[in-house]
Design a protein with these regions (language model features):
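Short Lys/Arg-enriched alpha/beta "domain-start" segment
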Residues: 4-215
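Short secondary-structure boundary segments
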Residues: 39-66, 232-251, 371-375
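N-proximal short alpha-helices
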Residues: 72, 79, 223-226, 230, ...
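Transmembrane helix-loop junctions and nearby membrane-interface residues
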Residues: 83-85, 370-377
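Membrane-associated alpha-helical segments
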Residues: 252-369, 376
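Peripheral, non-transmembrane regulatory/ligand-interaction domains of membrane transport proteins
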Residues: 152-281, 285
Length: 378
């Protein structure tokens, strides 16, 4: 799209010479059913450290914080639009590896940041490929810690966050957004601002969070805008990463359930149902899969209980709303209920057939006893 230039108007949010910040790319990879973090002593030849966020706002006491293991590799050899790219890798017990990559920028208007959508390094590699390579190397080093490793490579759930820490002198982030609302909506949807309808602009900006006048968060489906004039955005990025991680997990569970249910229905359509062997194998698979999915669903939800900071909780709830996480969870639970019914049907059918054959065997033995008795009397 054409570059959008800032207006010469002197109002808040207009006429800025330069906005400063960084663009952050979040990737979530579902690599296993579980990662046993207690066994992880090294990631990419580096000692991992528990990732912690700074809590500056009011929070309840004694609130447990989930701390995934993390490493910070050296910056990439190739730059992104002239800026170095700094990766950060985290591993989560629920079987997810996340790759975060950050690059600084300076721009005169939000529209100039459109170039960061679908990023490609100066070497020609895409960031998607770099993130996938990081994930593959991490998984190779975590072989003994991965439980139920998934087929590789899994498709990543990527999310882009535009972080602004300097609005060229503006101190009120919310007033700035009011002036730049259409350009921000165009940036987050990767669409020319002048093409967007007013209802679409309102929808893109619908989920906003702000604690002070110096900060705000706008969350859309594919990208988000984070403004914090204090310069610290890691806490909000962490909340968005967890929501993105949950979306990846629920999406993968939903796909696996669909495939497994299709196979299970095909097995049920076979007549007659074998009494042993395949029947026992089907029951074992159904039982194991039901337990695995129930456990994963609970653990994926559990990792967000760390939000003792009320503002971060509101940011996370906004992301959960935008990503439709409740609907994804409901879809998984619905398929889990179908799996329970299927398990009951298979179990009941196998038991009925076994009881029928048991009755036939009893009748046969009774007939044999009767024949033997008659032969003896003769």
């Amino acid at each position: 799209m054409p570059v959008l230039h800032a207006s010469t108007n002197c109002g808040i949010g207009l006429g800025f010479n330069r906005m400063k910040g960084e663009v952050v790319f979040l990737y979530a990879f579902d690599v296993a059913n579980e990662i046993i973090s207690s066994r992880v002593h090294e990631i990419l030849s580096a000692k991992p450290f528990p990732f912690e966020i700074r809590m500056d706002r009011t929070l309840p006491k004694d609130m447990p914080l989930y701390k995934p293991l993390a490493i910070e590799p050296p910056p990439l050899a190739a730059s992104l639009h002239g800026a170095p790219v700094q990766p950060l890798i985290r591993i989560y017990d629920v079987g997810v590896v996340t790759v975060m990559m950050r690059a600084a920028f300076a721009a005169a208007a939000p529209g100039e940041l459109m170039r960061f959508h679908n990023p490609q390094l100066e070497s020609g590699l895409t960031l998607d490929a770099v993130a996938l390579d990081f994930c593959a190397k991490v998984c190779d080093g975590l072989k003994d810690s991965l439980v139920g490793r998934t087929e590789f490579p899994p498709p990543p759930e990527a999310y882009t966050v535009f972080c602004l820490t300097d609005l060229d002198g503006a101190k009120d982030a919310n007033a700035w957004l009011a002036e730049q609302r259409r350009d921000v909506a165009g940036l987050l949807t990767e669409t020319a601002a002048e093409k967007l309808s007013e209802p679409q602009v309102n929808e893109v900006l619908r989920i906003q969070r702000s604690f002070e006048n110096s900060d705000l968060v706008v969350i859309d489906w594919d990208a988000a805008l984070v403004v914090d004039l204090t310069g610290y955005v890691d806490d909000v990025l962490y909340a968005l990463e967890l929501a993105n991680l949950q979306l990846e997990e629920f999406r993968m569970m939903d796909q696996r359930l669909d495939k497994y249910l299709d196979r299970a229905y095909n097995d049920l359509e076979r007549r007659p149902m074998p009494l042993f062997g395949a029947a026992n194998k089907t029951l074992q698979h159904l039982r194991r899969f039901r337990v695995d999915v129930a456990k994963l669903t609970d653990e994926v939800t559990h990792i967000t209980k760390f939000f003792g900071d009320w503002y971060l909780a509101r940011v996370y709830l906004g992301a959960r709303d935008r990503f439709y996480l409740d609907q994804w969870r409901a879809s998984v639970e619905q398929r889990l209920a179908q799996l329970d019914k299927l398990y009951s049907v298979v179990h009941a059918e196998v038991n009925e057939q076994r009881m029928l054959w048991l009755e036939i065997i009893i009748v046969i033995f009774f007939a044999l006893d009767l024949m033997i008795l008659l032969c003896v009397k003769r």
